[in-house]
From Swiss-Prot:
Lineage of producing organism: Bacteria, Bacillati, Actinomycetota, Actinomycetes, Mycobacteriales
Disulfide-bonded cysteines: none
The gene coding this protein: rplJ
Species this chain originates from: Mycobacterium avium (strain 104)
Protein's job: Forms part of the ribosomal stalk, playing a central role in the interaction of the ribosome with GTP-bound translation factors.
Pfam families cross-referenced by the UniProt entry: Ribosomal_L10
Family: Belongs to the universal ribosomal protein uL10 family.
Top-level taxonomic group: Bacteria
PROSITE patterns according to UniProt: RIBOSOMAL_L10
Keyword Thylakoid on entry: no
UniProt cross-references to PANTHER family, sorted A to Z: 39S RIBOSOMAL PROTEIN L10, MITOCHONDRIAL (PTHR11560)
Complex formation: Part of the ribosomal stalk of the 50S ribosomal subunit. The N-terminus interacts with L11 and the large rRNA to form the base of the stalk. The C-terminus forms an elongated spine to which L12 dimers bind in a sequential fashion forming a multimeric L10(L12)X complex.
Protein's name according to its UniProt entry: Large ribosomal subunit protein uL10
GO CC term, one of those recorded: large ribosomal subunit
Length: 196
């Protein structure tokens, strides 16, 4: 590869690193071209899957300001540059790796830090953003429906509830009859003295 071609390749890879929300790094030793094409299809729009020389990828990562991945760039390495939801891409790669033992997840990079294999697999085990938002909306809807039912209850139901509580309280501890207050004669007010 000519020097100008290498510089162009490094610039392209660096741009992919900068635009990606996450990167997933794999070893593809033993996979056929058909397997790689199948993996790319399974990633659909969530990521692009690229194979490049490790030296070029190391330079591109350095140019993009990404650190901590150099040890992952050894052997036949391919990178999934995730532009969509990281969970979807990680799920696709993890599923493919289970079906094709030749694909090995090496790690990744997301939110400014390197990810271990275990962290990439934990991301793959998460539910997608849409599912989590749907669950949150469902929980909120249920609570809002309960509150709306409470606020829409007729005033008569509230009055009956208050009366029932009052009767229950009266039955539990009968109120003592109030003692009549002892009457005391009222004193006549004193007349003011005239100073004449």
């Amino acid at each position: 590869m000519a020097r100008a071609d290498k510089a162009t390749a490094v610039a392209d890879i660096a741009e992919q690193f900068k635009e990606a929300t996450a990167t997933l790094i794999t070893e593809y030793r033993g996979l056929t071209v058909a397997n790689l094409a199948e993996l790319r299809r399974s990633l659909s729009g969530a990521a692009t899957y690229s194979v490049a020389k490790n030296t070029l990828v190391k330079r591109a990562a350095s140019e993009a300001g990404i650190e901590g991945l150099d040890e992952l760039f050894a052997g036949p390495t391919a990178i999934a540059f995730v532009t969509g939801e990281p969970v979807d891409a990680a799920k696709a790669i993890k599923t493919f790796a289970k079906e094709h033992k030749a694909l090995v997840i090496k790690g990744g990079y997301m939110d400014g830090r390197a990810l271990s294999v275990a962290e990439v697999e934990r991301i793959a085990d998460l539910e997608s953003r849409e599912v989590l938002l749907a669950k949150l909306a469902g929980a909120m809807k249920g609570n809002l429906a309960k509150a709306a039912g409470l606020f829409n209850a007729p005033a008569s139901q509230v009055a009956r509830l208050a009366a029932a509580l009052q009767e229950k309280k009266a039955a539990e501890c009968p109120a003592e009859a109030p003692q009549p207050a002892a009457e005391t004669p009222a004193e006549a007010p004193e007349a003011p003295a005239d100073a004449e």
